[in-house]
Every structure is written in C-alpha cells, then in structure tokens.
C-alpha cells in the first residue's frame, strides 16, 4: 500500500471514529472554541508521551494508535472551527 492509500485508510478510520463520537457527544468540542480543542490536543500529546515512554496505557483499551487517531481528529476539529470564523 502506498502512502496515499495509507492516508486514505487513516482518514477513513478517523471519520468513522468522529461520526461515532459526534453521535454520542454532538458538537461539544466547539463549546470552548479552538483553545478548547488545543487543550484536548495537549492532553492527547501527554498521553502519547506517557505511552511511548512508559509503555503504560493510562486509559484502559487506549493505546498509541487510538491516541494518534484522536489527535488526527482534534486537528481536523480545530480546522473546522477556524473555518467558521
């Protein structure tokens, strides 16, 4: 699989996860605007550093792949909010 196909696969997984979480939480991510999303990104970065450094998942069933996919989605959410301005 080439890099473009890999990116399509990741984006497809991200969209599926976003769709599921958006059904559960709605647009809660927009409540505090871009700053709020950036704070969530910081949380995810700290989680990924902890997983990478210690090999320990602080959240049950959430490994590095899940955390990186969340980061992908949070970046997209921040872009959505920026486009609304």
What residue spans do the PLM features occupy?
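Intrinsically disordered, low-complexity regulatory regions
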Residues: 1-85
């Amino acid at each position: 699989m080439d890099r473009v196909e890999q990116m399509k696969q990741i984006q497809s997984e991200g969209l599926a996860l976003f769709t599921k979480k958006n059904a559960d939480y709605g647009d809660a991510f927009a409540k505090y605007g871009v700053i709020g999303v950036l704070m969530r990104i910081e949380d995810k970065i700290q989680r990924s550093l902890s997983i990478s450094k210690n090999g320990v998942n602080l959240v049950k069933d959430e490994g590095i792949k899940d955390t990186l996919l969340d980061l992908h989605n949070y970046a997209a959410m921040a872009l959505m909010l920026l486009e609304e301005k």
